[in-house]
Curated annotation (Swiss-Prot):
Pathway(s) it belongs to: Cell wall biogenesis; peptidoglycan biosynthesis
Keyword Heme: no
InterPro entries: Beta-lactam/transpept-like, Glyco_trans_51, Glycosyltr_51/Transpeptidase, Lysozyme-like_dom_sf, PBP_1b, PBP_transglycosylase, PCN-bd_Tpept, UB2H
Record-given protein name: Penicillin-binding protein 1B
Gene Ontology BP term (one): peptidoglycan biosynthetic process
Gene: mrcB
Region of interest (Transpeptidase), ranges: 395-687
Membrane topology annotation: Single-pass type II membrane protein
C-alpha cells in the first residue's frame, strides 16, 4: 500500500498532466486555426507595381538595331557571346538574337521565347521564332519595374512561385540555413542544442539553431521581442506548420517572406525583389555567386549590405561558396572561379524605384480614369507609357546641365522641369519635376505655372497662317515702333531684344529670330479674339487667358505639361491627342481592369500646323536655336526658345520625328536665372539629344500646300534661273499658278 500523501501527489500530478496536456492541445488547436487563417487567407498585401511601357516590335517599324539594343539594355537584358538564359541577347552584323523573358502582359501570359531580329539597311525587316523558324508579325518586350508604392506594413515584395526560383538558389539556401530541411518535422533538436551550448560557452549569441520553418514562423506570426514564451510559440507553431503543409509550400513562403534589406523606410522582402534591388535582374537569371550573396544576407541583411559594407559582404559571400565546396555542392575549380568574381551589384543610383514626378501623374490619372485611390488596391500592376531610355537621358541631361549652369552663373537654387511626350499618340515618355530626379514633393512639371515668354509666338503665327488668303510665310510684317494703350491707361511700348527696328520683316524670319515688335503688329492686325480662339482650339482653358496685347509676347502662365499639350497639336498636323501616362491596369489576379486606346481629334488645320512647324524648323536651322542645328544638321529639328522679362524663366520646346520635349529652367523665388532660352533650357535639350538619339523630323506637305520660290523681296519667282537669293517656302494655296500670272 502506498501512503495517502503519495497517492494524493500521484493523483495531483496525473490531473495536472492531464490539464496541462489539455491546455497544450487547446492552445495547439488555437495556433492551428491561427496559422490556417493566415496561410489560407491573404498572407500578404502587396504594393502597387508600376512598369515602364511595353515596347512592341514589328517588321518595318522605325526601330534601328541601335534603338533595340538600347531598349534591351534599359530593360536589363545582358549582352553576351553565348545565349544561356532569358534576359540575354547577342549582336551579329545584321541581326540580334535574344531570349525574351516570360511575362504576364495585359493581353495574357507569354512564355520565354528565342527570337532572331533581322535588319536590312538598319531597319527591322523580320522577326523569326528560332524554335520553328516561323515569322512573327509582332514581338512584345517585357517592361521594367520602375516603382513600387503604397507598401502595406512598410514591406515591399514580389511574389514568385517556388518552381520559378533557380535550383542553385534553393540548394544554396538549404545548405547554409537548413541542411536537414526535408528530414525534420519543423524543428531540428540537434541544431538547437548545439547552438545552445555554443552560445552558453561563448557567453553571448553567436549561432542560431532555427530551421527555415522556425524562421518563417518568426517572420509571419511572431513579434521581434525575444523571450522564452516566443521561443515556445516558435517551436510549437513550426511543428504545426510542418505537419499541416508540404515542404514545398513552406519553402515557397520562406523564399517570398525573408528580410533582405531596406529601401529607405520600407523593407525588401523575398529573394525575388532582392534580386531586382541589388542586381537589376529577375531571380531566375542570377548566377551561383549572386545567389550566394543573397543567401549570405539572410544572416543579417543590414550587416551584409553590399553597398554599405562591400568587403564584409564579399567575405560572407565567399564563405557561403566555401560551405558549398565543403559539402561537395560545387567542385574546387568552380569555387576558385566564383570566389574571384566581384560582387557585381548595380550601383545604388541605378535602382529605378521611384520616378516621383511621373508616379504623381500616374496616380492622378488612375484616380480620374478608374475612380478609386491607389490605397484601395493591393497588388495591382500598372503598365505606363514611360520610356526608360528617354527618362534616364532626361535625368542625366538635367543633372549635368543644371550643375554646369549653377557653376557658370553662381546660382545654387536653379530648378528645372522637363516633359517628353510622343508627338502623335500624346503618351508621356518622361517627366522631371525638379533638378533632382528622385526628389519627392513639388512637381514643377505639373504644378509650377510660369510665364512662357516667346513660346507663345508660334501660336500667334499659327492663328495668322490659318488664314492663307491674308497671311503666308513670306508676308511682310511691320517692324516699327508701336504704342498700345493698356486698360490701366498706361502706354505699352514693346521692344526687340536688340532695341532696334528694321522697318519690315517676313513672317517666317520674324518667327525664327523671335522678334517682339513684328508679332505685336501682327496680333493687332489679327485681333485678340482670333488669337484667344486659337489657344482654346489647342486645348487651353479660357480661364488661363487674359485678353491683353501682351499675350503675343508670352504674358500667359502655364506649366510645362500644359505647354507640351499645346505643341503636341502643332507637331502632329493639328491633331489633339489625349495626354496619358497609363496604358493598362491589371488586378492582383491578372484580370484587366483598365486599358487606354490612343485617341486624337483634328482641332487645327493640317496646313496651318505644317506651315508653323516648318517655320519652327527654321528656328533651329538658322534662327535663335541655330547652335543646336549645327550639331544635328540632318535631323531637321523644330524648336522655339523662350525667355521672360529679366531672364526669370528660360524655356525651350524641341520637336524631332517622334517626340515633343519641353524644358524649363527657373528659380522658385522668381529671381533672374541669368539664362536666355538659348543659353539655358536649350542647352539641357541639347544634352538630352546627345543621350537619346533624335529621329529626323521629315515633314510631308498636306493637301494644297506647295513649295514655291521667292526672291529676296519675298516675291514669288516662277522661272527656274538660279540666284543665291532664291529660297523655296511652303505655301497654302488651291492653285499654285495663281502666283505666277
Amino acid at each position: 500500500m502506498y501512503p495517502v500523501n503519495l497517492k494524493l501527489s500521484i493523483k495531483f500530478l496525473f490531473y495536472f498532466f492531464l490539464y496541462f496536456l489539455l491546455i497544450i492541445i487547446i492552445y495547439g488547436v488555437y495556433l492551428y486555426f491561427k496559422i490556417n487563417q493566415v496561410i489560407h487567407g491573404k498572407i500578404w498585401k502587396f504594393p502597387i507595381s508600376i512598369y515602364s511601357r511595353i515596347v512592341t516590335l514589328e517588321p518595318g517599324n522605325n526601330y534601328s538595331k541601335k534603338d533595340i539594343i538600347a531598349i534591351l539594355k534599359s530593360n536589363r537584358y545582358k549582352q553576351v557571346n553565348f545565349l544561356t538564359m532569358p534576359g540575354e541577347f547577342l549582336v551579329k552584323r545584321n541581326s540580334l538574337i535574344l531570349i525574351r523573358r516570360s511575362f504576364n502582359f495585359p493581353e495574357g501570359f507569354e512564355d520565354k521565347i528565342s527570337i532572331k531580329l533581322l535588319f536590312d539597311k538598319n531597319k527591322l525587316v523580320r522577326i523569326v521564332h528560332l524554335s520553328n523558324n516561323r515569322n512573327f508579325s509582332i514581338l512584345r518586350l517585357d517592361p521594367q519595374l520602375i516603382a513600387m508604392i503604397y507598401s502595406p506594413k512598410g514591406e515591399k515584395r514580389l511574389f514568385v512561385s517556388q518552381k520559378n526560383y533557380p535550383k542553385a538558389l534553393i540548394q544554396t539556401l538549404l545548405t547554409i540555413e537548413d541542411k536537414c530541411f526535408y528530414n525534420h518535422y519543423g524543428i531540428n533538436f540537434y541544431s538547437m542544442f548545439r547552438a545552445f551550448f555554443v552560445n552558453l560557452i561563448s557567453g553571448h549569441s553567436i549561432q542560431g539553431g532555427s530551421t527555415l520553418t522556425q524562421q518563417l514562423v518568426k517572420n509571419l506570426f511572431l513579434t521581434n521581442i525575444r523571450s522564452l514564451w516566443r521561443k515556445i510559440n516558435e517551436i510549437y507553431m513550426a511543428l504545426i506548420l510542418d505537419f499541416q503543409y508540404s515542404k514545398e509550400k513552406i519553402l515557397e513562403l520562406y523564399l517570398n517572406e525573408v528580410y533582405l534589406g531596406q529601401d529607405k523606410n520600407e523593407q525588401i522582402r523575398g529573394f525575388a525583389l532582392a534580386s531586382l534591388y541589388y542586381f537589376g535582374r529577375p531571380i531566375n537569371e542570377l548566377r551561383l555567386d549572386e545567389c550566394a550573396l543573397l543567401v549570405g544576407m539572410v544572416k543579417g541583411a543590414s550587416l551584409y549590405n553590399p553597398w554599405n559594407n562591400p568587403v564584409l559582404t564579399l567575405n560572407r559571400r565567399n564563405l557561403v561558396l566555401y560551405v558549398l565546396f565543403k559539402h561537395k555542392v560545387i567542385n574546387r575549380t568552380l569555387y576558385e572561379k566564383l570566389k574571384s568574381k566581384p560582387l557585381n551589384i548595380q550601383s545604388r543610383g541605378n535602382i529605378i524605384w521611384f520616378r516621383s514626378a511621373f508616379v504623381q501623374i500616374v496616380e492622378k490619372e488612375f484616380q480620374k480614369k478608374v475612380g478609386y485611390y491607389f490605397q484601395n488596391f493591393s497588388g495591382i500592376k500598372i503598365f505606363t507609357t514611360l520610356d526608360l531610355i528617354s527618362q534616364i537621358a532626361a535625368e542625366n541631361a538635367i543633372r549635368h546641365g543644371i550643375q554646369q549652369l549653377k557653376k557658370k552663373y553662381k546660382l545654387q537654387d536653379l530648378e528645372a522641369s522637363m516633359v517628353i511626350i510622343d508627338r502623335f499618340s500624346g503618351e508621356i515618355r518622361g517627366v522631371l519635376g525638379s533638378s533632382n530626379p528622385n526628389l519627392l514633393g513639388y512637381n514643377r512639371a505639373i504644378q509650377a505655372k510660369r510665364s512662357i515668354g516667346s513660346l507663345s509666338k508660334p501660336i500667334t503665327y499659327l492663328a495668322a497662317l490659318s488664314q492663307p488668303e491674308y497671311f503666308r510665310l513670306n508676308t511682310w510684317i511691320p517692324d516699327t515702333p508701336i504704342k498700345i494703350k493698356m486698360q490701366n491707361g498706361k502706354l505699352w511700348k514693346p521692344q526687340n531684344n536688340n532695341f532696334e527696328f528694321v522697318g519690315k520683316v517676313m513672317l517666317i524670319d520674324a518667327l525664327k529670330n523671335s522678334m517682339n515688335v513684328p508679332i505685336v503688329h501682327l496680333s493687332m492686325k489679327l485681333g485678340l479674339k482670333k488669337i484667344v480662339q486659337t489657344w482654346i482650339q489647342l486645348g487651353l482653358s479660357s480661364n488661363h487667358i487674359f485678353k491683353y496685347p501682351s499675350i503675343a509676347l508670352g504674358s500667359i502662365n502655364l506649366t510645362s505639361m500644359e505647354v507640351a499639350k499645346i505643341f503636341q497639336v502643332i507637331s502632329s498636323g493639328g491633331n489633339k491627342a489625349n495626354i496619358i501616362s497609363i496604358r493598362s491596369v491589371l488586378s492582383e489576379n491578372n484580370k484587366l481592369i483598365y486599358h487606354s486606346f490612343p485617341q486624337s481629334k483634328q482641332v487645327i488645320s493640317a496646313q496651318a500646323s505644317y506651315l508653323t512647324l516648318y517655320a519652327m524648323q527654321s528656328v533651329v536651322s538658322s534662327g535663335t536655336a541655330k547652335h543646336l542645328g549645327k550639331f544635328f544638321k540632318n535631323m531637321h529639328l523644330a524648336g522655339k526658345t523662350g525667355t521672360t522679362n529679366n531672364l526669370v524663366d528660360s524655356w525651350f520646346v524641341g520637336i524631332d520625328g517622334r517626340q515633343v520635349v519641353i524644358v524649363w529652367i527657373g528659380r522658385d523665388n522668381n529671381k533672374t536665372t541669368k539664362c536666355y532660352g538659348s543659353t539655358g533650357a536649350m542647352k539641357i535639350y541639347h544634352n538630352y539629344l546627345k543621350l537619346n538619339n533624335p529621329k529626323p523630323l521629315l515633314l510631308i506637305p498636306p493637301r494644297d500646300v506647295y513649295f514655291l520660290n521667292i526672291n529676296k523681296s519675298g516675291d514669288f519667282m516662277c522661272f527656274r534661273s538660279y540666284s543665291k537669293y532664291f529660297r523655296a517656302i511652303p505655301v497654302w494655296i488651291r492653285n499654285h499658278n495663281i502666283f505666277c500670272t
